Amino acid sequence: GFLYRHGFIEGFGHLSARLAPDRFMIARHSLGAHAKPEDFVILDLEGRKLEGAGDPPAEAAIHVAVFKARPDVNSVVHYHGMYSTAFTTSEQALRPIHLMGTLFHDGIPVYPDVKLVRDPVRGAELAKVLGPHRAVLMRGHGATLTGPSVEDCIAATFLFEENAQRALLSATLGRPQWIDEQTAAEAGAELIKGRGPFRRVWAMVEAEHEQAAQR
């Protein structure tokens, strides 16, 4: 529910978690912000449903393809970001403009097809564009984020969208002052090594969950 409450997923988006090398769980297509364990379905890396009631999201092919191409990835988020998607509809590339944005210093590729990724062919094309990166933008559509864990993936999604928001705010004041590549690489490496951003965002997730449980 954290990404929903912050407006990152709304009615469009989904989160998955790898359970084993050849299978993962993903929330059902019809779900909103209040997903429970029983609301997930389990798929294999061919997109076949193994367990669970209901149908997976229409774009489960995104998750299938990324998990298949990236053994290092254990969680995937796809969402329609208000701020990050704006950079796919202009000539300005999204780059790190804020310290936390340096987590994406190695580049943010853009998948050029605006259509839904509903089949293995488009899924494989998206995974190819993603390559070894943490995030890929999807032109006029949204973004897909990856992580070695659900905690890291949710944190990366939050910080990715926050960097895009800051970049757009900066552009309203004049020419954005992007962090240069060398500085971004050094700062990003420090953040990844220390893991501070991931821990802080996950602490926010847990705090919001506790507050919601007390209502």
Locate predicted features.
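Glycine-rich flexible loops
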Residues: G1-R215
